[in-house]
Amino acid sequence: MPKNIVVIGAGLGGLTSAALLAQKGHKVTVLEQGDWIGGKSRRIEVAGQVIDTGPSLFTFPGVWETFLAKYQELGGKLPKDLEFIRLAEVGRYFFRGDQIDIPVPESHQWHKPWQKFVAQHKALEGPITTLLTSAPLDLKALPALGKLLNVYGTRLSTNNYLNSLSWMPEGLKDLIAIHTLNAGVSPDQTLPIYASMTAIMSEQGISVPRGGMNEVPQLLAKLAEESGAEILLGQRVMSISKHAVKTQERSYSADVVVSSLDASLTDALISGKTAKMAPNRSCSGVAIYAALKNPLPAGTVTHSVVMPDDPADLYRALKSNSSPNQTMSFVNYYEPGHIYSNKKATVAVLLTAPADSADYDLKTPWVRDELDRVSNLIGLERPIDELFEDFKVLNANYFEGFGALGGALYGAKNPLWQSGPFHNPSYRSLTKPWLYRVGASVHPGGGIPAVMGGAMNSISSLI
Ligand SMILES: Cc1cc2nc3c(=O)[nH]c(=O)nc-3n(C[C@H](O)[C@H](O)[C@H](O)COP(=O)(O)OP(=O)(O)OC[C@H]3O[C@@H](n4cnc5c(N)ncnc54)[C@H](O)[C@@H]3O)c2cc1C
């Protein structure tokens, strides 16, 4: 029987759910508090140039393909799919005075161990995609789980697993381990699967849709609307109950509620109590988006990763929610006409930051120091912000405005045993069978593959 379904939030989690549920024939209304589609994946203009904020790299394309296949199975017609442009490298990493591209080139001393590592993880690409798109404890996922256990054995964290690889140089371990920050947590708090992700990304490559990342939520919204879903912007949900979702303006009756909000915010809207900041939280970011007066020097790659000299020190700072001495930064650089049809070059400098609600800007001492360090390491003669024509800074305070308290990008940080199939919260609870949870705070990992996979898993019984 078609149901009245209210989806809360028009980010990637909400839109993935809305497209599939509407295509299945349910009556779907999406309520979004902001005035844009995409949540953290937002499109802005800086000095007349189009820049997408939030996610910048598209990984694990098998999850996207699984979504499209499900949409078609339900009878949906696909418009032209996105054109994914594979970047020449996974990234150029700057670490302790060295500069290393991934995949590690033959000329680098780490080439052999890197090749060995990639070879050991090659067979896990399919199983990881299966696990990302399978409900917890789904029997069909057991063979995939078996393949992972064959590689990791009893090593339960990324750190434990990497430390067991006696043949691997310590620096290479650090470089692989830092990728757990893409899930907002340190490598002692994540499953070993995160180590494999680096190797798989190196094989599969990373990509960006032509036109930019915001093309992803735009296409999802189009599929949802073409399937009959109604997407209402500027509708802030004030309370959620078994039969109704209330905004400031009106009440929407609902047989089912799909919430893509941070789990703590969903709970607060149900209980009527004020949401509490989780003591242990995933990281936030200071994200600086700029249009440049002139392109960066020739040879600057699209995606650079500037590592801290002492990753352990950064993990400690993030755990105690204090400012780091040095952090891990992404520098995403687009030449004019690359990916976007911009006339000017643009850059995003994304500094990993504590989830402390702060309103940091370029004058904040640790941000200033990091910008200078990043500029120097990527080979600029002047601080990068001297090349900005105009810029915009998004920080923990901004992310808190529509997400988890503190600005934690992936919500609360759960104990290790809850970072797999037993994740907390679960997609559904026994006491509230009408509530389905999706979004970055639910499926471990929190990036686009986890959010889209998690949404498909959560609502599977409804489609
Ligand atoms: C700087 C940055 C870089 C990133 N880089 C990558 C990357 O390269 N690759 C990758 O895979 N992932 C990346 N991520 C993660 C990825 O962006 C997120 O995991 C994903 O976008 C989260 O989607 P979501 O639907 O869970 O949440 P959101 O996008 O936060 O959506 C939730 C929506 O709910 C709305 N909302 C909140 N409260 C209410 C309310 N009361 N009523 C109505 N609506 C409400 C919000 O406005 C928002 O639109 C990055 C994130 C950031 C911030």
State the predicted function of each range.
Residues 295-397:
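C-terminal segments that line or cap access tunnels to active or ligand-binding sites in enzymes
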Residues 3-123:
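N-terminal glycine-rich phosphate/pyrophosphate-binding loop and immediately adjacent elements
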Residues 83-85, 230-234, 436:
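General small-molecule cofactor/ligand-binding pocket signal
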Residues 196-239:
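Helical element adjacent to the flavin cofactor pocket in flavoenzyme catalytic cores
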Residues 55, 440-462:
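A conserved FAD-binding loop/helix module that cradles the flavin
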Residues 171-183, 380-444:
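A glycine-rich dinucleotide-binding beta-alpha-beta segment and adjacent secondary-structure elements
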Residues 94-189:
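Rossmann-like flavin
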Residues 238-342:
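Mid-domain catalytic core of redox enzymes
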